[in-house]
């Protein structure tokens, strides 16, 4: 799935659409990528001379990847995150890096979902954690 296809499922738009591509494998694991160009707004001032993607943005990249696991359930719904747990930051992500996420659904009941996600660069783990969210009706005027 490319960015245009992803936009059919996620309400995010530039500059906050943080998934460039996503594939769902036969085991229902989402594999997504986001290439950090160095032009992103969140790198301005974080940190001058040594830009690093903020941890909260890395969590958002994982969150969007997790939401895409339920892509068929997303139509007409919005994801509202209810928790980010057991997050561990291991390595930094910098301009020029491609963040690769593996996300797995670990729990689902009614409209509540819990996923585990790992974000890596070149096979080196940068952050991991559990993300929980609810799917609620999209009541925005379109």
Residue ranges and their predicted role:
Residues 1-6, 97-101:
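Short Pro/Gly-enriched beta-strand edge/turn motifs at strand-loop
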Residues 11, 27-31, 93-97, 104-142:
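HotDog/MaoC-like acyl-thioester-processing domains
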Residues 14-53:
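Catalytic strand-loop segment that frames the active site of acyl-thioester-processing enzymes
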Residues 16-18, 99, 113:
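Hydrophobic core residues within well-ordered beta-strands of beta-rich domains
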Residues 20-23, 85, 90, 102-106, ...:
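Conserved positions in beta-strands of structured domains
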Residues 22, 53-76:
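Active-site helix/loop of acyl-thioester processing domains in fatty-acid/polyketide metabolism
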Residues 65-100, 130-134:
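Hydrophobic beta-strand-centered segment that forms part of the acyl-chain substrate-binding groove
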């Amino acid at each position: 799935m490319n960015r245009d296809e992803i936009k059919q499922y996620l309400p995010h738009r530039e500059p906050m659409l943080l998934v460039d591509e996503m594939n769902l494998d036969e085991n229902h694991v989402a594999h997504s990528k986001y290439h950090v160009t160095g032009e992103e707004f969140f790198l301005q001032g974080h940190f001058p001379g040594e830009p690093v993607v903020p941890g909260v943005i890395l969590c958002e990249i994982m969150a969007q990847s997790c939401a895409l696991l339920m892509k068929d359930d997303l139509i007409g719904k919005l994801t509202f995150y209810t928790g980010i747990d057991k997050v561990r930051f291991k390595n930094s992500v910098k301009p020029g890096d491609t963040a690769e996420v593996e996300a797995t659904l670990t729990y689902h009941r009614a409209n509540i979902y819990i996923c585990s996600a790992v974000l890596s660069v070149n096979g080196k783990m940068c952050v991991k954690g559990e993300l929980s969210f609810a799917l609620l009706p999209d009541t925005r005027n379109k």
